[in-house]
Amino acid sequence: MILVFIGPPGSGKGTQASLLSEKFSIISVGKVLRTVMESNTAEADVVKKFIKSGKLVPSNITNKIVVNALKNIEQCKSIILDGYPRDIFQADFLQENLQMDFKVLFFDIDDAVVLRRLRGRISCTDCGTIYNKLYCMPKINGVCDICNSSSFQNRVDDDESIIKLRLESYKKETLPLLEFYKAQNKLTLIDANQSTENILKKIKKMSGIY
């Protein structure tokens, strides 16, 4: 099974994916794109330009990332695809290249909550694990839970002006996917304004794996 997580930045997709990682392989397109942005490849400058402007990275880049990631995961594995597809073109591409059944979870959240959450978001410089100053800090203050690094940073795309551009881009490009997947009876709406615990319970119940 594949669970596709779709929602605006700051809606909690990555947090839920991390909490479910014991039973799911995680493909976080945003995380992979940030890795590409820091590399010495021809695509790095292109990705950096789009992320810093708050726009969607071109589909020819994200599609290739997703296909390569899916090839590297065992066929028997359950998968969470976090942050993809982001428009109708990518949704069509995904269905053409996906050999497994999938469900789409749409994280619905108020813009004001998104802005508040993203202002407090930080990530580990070494492994990329995301934390939040408001509700999800490392268990030991200043030490990453995953790799024990003490180096943290604010993400370049979490600047407030960029956040607002990302939300505008999301509403224009990604929201139409609601009707696309509703028509296929694949869509489940998640109230992402709720607590992390309540959202996790709902996802576990509907996945049928727990």
Curated annotation (Swiss-Prot):
ATP binds at G10, S11, G12, K13, G14, T15, R121, I130, Y131, Q194. One of its GO terms (molecular function) is zinc ion binding. It comes from Orientia tsutsugamushi (strain Boryong) (Rickettsia tsutsugamushi). It comes from the Bacteria. Disulfide bonds: none annotated. One of its GO terms (biological process) is AMP salvage. Its main location: cytoplasm. It is found in: Cytoplasm. The keyword Metal-binding applies. Its EC number is 2.7.4.3. Catalyzes the reversible transfer of the terminal phosphate group between ATP and AMP. Plays an important role in cellular energy homeostasis and in adenine nucleotide metabolism. This is Adenylate kinase. Monomer. InterPro entries: Adenyl_kin_sub, Adenylat/UMP-CMP_kin, Adenylat_kinase_CS, Adenylate_kinase_lid-dom, ADK_active_lid_dom_sf, P-loop_NTPase. Pathway: Purine metabolism; AMP biosynthesis via salvage pathway; AMP from ADP: step 1/1. Keywords: ATP-binding, Cytoplasm, Kinase, Metal-binding, Nucleotide biosynthesis, Nucleotide-binding, Transferase, Zinc. Zn(2+) binds at C124, C127, C144, C147. Consists of three domains, a large central CORE domain and two small peripheral domains, NMPbind and LID, which undergo movements during catalysis. The LID domain closes over the site of phosphoryl transfer upon ATP binding. Assembling and dissambling the active center during each catalytic cycle provides an effective means to prevent ATP hydrolysis. Some bacteria have evolved a zinc-coordinating structure that stabilizes the LID domain. One of its GO terms (cellular component) is cytoplasm. It is an enzyme of class 2 (transferase). Belongs to the adenylate kinase family.
